Amino acid sequence: VNLGVSMTVTTLAWTGPFRISDLLAACMDDDHAWPPASKGVYLVSRDDWRDSPSSACHPLYVGGNTGDSQRFCTRIGDLIADLHGLWDGGTGHHSGGQSLYSWCRTNKVHPGSLRIGWATRTPWCDRCAEVELVSLLATSWEERGTLLNKSRPPACRTHGRERGRP
């Protein structure tokens, strides 16, 4: 896909998905995949997928981090802590993790049984990647189905990707 402004987008390269409990259990295993420090987008889903996610995996939350911040792995850590209810009095670190925690309680699903996977590519644009991921999972923001995100990803001002559309 050519987005103009001299950037050609390649397909997102996915790692995972992993059961969240399995990912945490492997935290001391140097051979297990771990989220990168930056340049990533992630998906939390109820079910597994192969190669790349689709709406069939019951997607629950899409996220990433913006700019050149080295906080991508930290964001996933914040999400996992809040997903397991490790927040109180509105002082959590990740609103998506809190939404997922509520969904898990309502649906009687243990947070550790959810799946998480992340993707990256070169060249990298965080906004384009989030918009692309949402467009893989839903035909429009209004029909996002099971996604718990409260707002759709912002448009990419650099490459002209529209909000929530490829």
Model-derived segments and spans:
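Boundary/linker segments flanking structured domains
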Residues: V1-L60, G64-P166
